[in-house]
């Protein structure tokens, strides 16, 4: 706030630079006696364009202000008004008035220093006193605005922090946003997992092998595969939709590489194997029993590696596994439970797409994508869908799709299949319908062939008809429903 200074003191602004004290006194002396005329100058002793005039009689000052305000003096309109004291004066020292023409902070500062011998604060006159007592005019001019940018007082410090805080906060927000997003995108790239599951899949990153499929290592990570199981299924579903086969195929073909060298052979062989199937007229499943299953049996230690993941994987997707391994003859499963852990989602997807149980799907699809040879999926699918190849395979092996489970290591899958399937049921509700009873349905040991669990005959009936149609043989049903020991073992003897 500014208050009126000496009642007889006037501020005259907007003066011509050529106007001096004598001229001012001559002009304003007409209104009454003048006690003092103060023209503000810069260092070079040039007028800064404003002055203070003190009348001996305050009434004369008022009259002069009314008469001369807005009048032209030496070619310039001047402003005349009662001089005001600045509210921020300190120690009796007052800020000098500023001219509306001199709005530059540097100009104000220089002129103040020149006339007063330097300044210490943001007020030019704080270091020295004015002859007129430091009175300032009551102006609504840019007088103070010209000086504000250069002031170094507490007010500038108090005003400064908010911008400083806002900028870092914006940076921090952007940094924090980028920090949270980076890993999710990376995880999503690696695993195809929806963002909501990214946090745990990153843990999975650490536990899994460096390969992006990350499902097939024998290093005991498969107890952690439950997390993988939790997150891989969606990725499975995506992969299956995009590529026509599940990641399980990828993991079968890639993951088995980690399990056994024999797996590797089978994994790399599939394309030629697909041709071999066409040449020999038997399905991938048959070939897996004639070749792949031998590999599996020759490497039972592979199955020994898998149990940790089997326990977990089988609990989650055991039912689906059972179907798959049932339909696939455990060909890939003994060596990699991990694959079994990831297949169910994709099987569930296939089940929805094809409208029949996973059993039917595998029967009709010929285990093409369950075999773990994703590259041969389309080819194997078409080949296996042809009834002739399977009929030949069935006749050759003396058993249908059901015999392979006799060879599969059923005991390791145990009854844990169904109760762990509850997790999968939440995520894959429809798949549960098709797999629920099958979880306990096959409880096969390698030596005891495919004994059905009497608890779930309904799903057996639901599952069996399509395989029968797909293969053109009822030996599948016989081997499963009747226990199939003689028949499936006959198939084994024919194979081996």
Swiss-Prot record:
UniProt-listed SMART domains: RRM (SM00360)
Cystine pairings recorded for this chain: none
Pfam families: RBM1CTR (PF08081), RRM_1 (PF00076)
Ranges of biased composition (kind: Low complexity): 97-114, 149-159
Biased composition (Basic and acidic residues): 204-214, 242-253, 276-289, 313-326, 335-349, 484-496
Top-rank lineage group of the source organism: Eukaryota
Domain RRM stretches: 8-85
Keyword Chaperone assigned: no
Subcellular location: Nucleus
GO molecular function: RNA binding
GO annotations of cellular component type: nucleolus; nucleoplasm; nucleus; spliceosomal complex
Keyword field contains RNA-binding: yes
Region described as Disordered: 67-349, 452-496
Keywords annotated in UniProt: mRNA processing, mRNA splicing, Nucleus, RNA-binding
UniProt-listed PANTHER family: TRANSFORMER-2 SEX-DETERMINING PROTEIN-RELATED
Subunit details: Interacts with splicing factor proteins SFRS3/SRP20, TRA2B/SFRS10, KHDRBS1/SAM68 and KHDRBS3.
Role description: RNA-binding protein which may be involved in spermatogenesis. Required for sperm development, possibly by participating in pre-mRNA splicing in the testis.
Something else known: The RBMY1 proteins are encoded by repeated regions of the Y chromosome, mostly within the AZFb region. The exact number of functional copies is unclear and may vary between individuals, and some of them may represent pseudogenes. The proteins are very similar, which makes the characterization of each protein difficult. Thus, most experiments do not discriminate between the different members. One can therefore suppose that reported interactions with a RBMY1 protein involve all the proteins.
Listed name of the protein: RNA-binding motif protein, Y chromosome, family 1 member B
């Amino acid at each position: 706030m500014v208050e009126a200074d000496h009642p007889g003191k006037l501020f005259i602004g907007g003066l011509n630079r050529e106007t001096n004290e004598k001229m001012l006194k001559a002009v304003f002396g007409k209104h009454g006696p003048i006690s003092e005329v103060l023209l503000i100058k810069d260092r070079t002793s040039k007028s800064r364009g404003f002055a203070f005039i003190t009348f001996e009689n305050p009434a004369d000052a008022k009259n002069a202000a009314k008469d001369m305000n807005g009048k032209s003096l030496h070619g310039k309109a001047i402003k005349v008004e009662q001089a005001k004291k600045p509210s921020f004066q300190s120690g009796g020292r007052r800020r000098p008035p500023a001219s509306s023409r001199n709005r530059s902070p540097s100009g104000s500062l220089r002129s103040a220093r020149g006339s007063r011998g330097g300044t210490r604060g943001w007020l030019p006159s704080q270091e020295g006193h004015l002859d007129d007592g430091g009175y300032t005019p009551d102006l609504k001019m840019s007088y103070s605005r010209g000086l504000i940018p250069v002031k170094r007082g507490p007010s500038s410090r108090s005003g400064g922090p908010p911008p400083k805080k806002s900028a870092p906060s914006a940076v921090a927000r952007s940094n924090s946003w980028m920090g949270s997003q980076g890993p999710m995108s990376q995880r999503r790239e690696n695993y195809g997992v929806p963002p909501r599951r990214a946090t745990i899949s990153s843990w999975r990153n650490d536990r899994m092998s460096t390969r992006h499929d990350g499902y097939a290592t024998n290093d005991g990570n498969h107890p952690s595969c439950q997390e993988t199981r939790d997150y891989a299924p969606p990725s499975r579903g995506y992969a299956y939709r995009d590529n026509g086969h599940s990641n399980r195929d990828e993991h079968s073909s890639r993951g088995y590489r980690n399990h056994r060298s024999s797996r590797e052979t089978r994994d790399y062989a599939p394309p030629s194997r697909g041709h071999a199937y066409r040449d020999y007229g038997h399905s991938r499943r048959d070939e897996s029993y004639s070749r792949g299953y031998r590999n599996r049996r020759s490497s039972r230690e592979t199955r020994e590696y898998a149990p940790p993941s089997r326990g977990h994987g089988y609990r989650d997707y055991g039912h689906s596994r059972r179907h798959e391994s049932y339909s696939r003859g455990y060909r890939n499963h003994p060596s990699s439970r991990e694959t079994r852990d990831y297949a169910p989602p994709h099987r569930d997807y296939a089940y929805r797409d094809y409208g029949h149980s996973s059993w039917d799907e595998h029967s009709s699809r010929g285990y093409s994508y369950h075999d773990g040879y994703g590259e041969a999926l389309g080819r194997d699918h078409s080949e296996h869908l042809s009834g002739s190849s399977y009929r030949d395979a069935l006749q050759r092996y003396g058993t249908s799709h059901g015999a392979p489970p006799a060879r599969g290591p059923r005991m390791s899958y145990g009854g844990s299949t169904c109760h762990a399937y509850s997790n999968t049921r939440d995520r894959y509700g429809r798949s549960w319908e098709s797999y629920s009873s099958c979880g306990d349905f096959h409880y096969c040991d390698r030596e005891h062939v495919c004994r059905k669990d009497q608890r779930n005959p309904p799903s057996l009936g639901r599952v069996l008809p399509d395989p029968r149609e797909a293969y053109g043989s009822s030996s599948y049903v016989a081997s499963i429903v009747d226990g199939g020991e003689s028949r499936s073992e006959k198939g084994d003897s024919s194979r081996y």
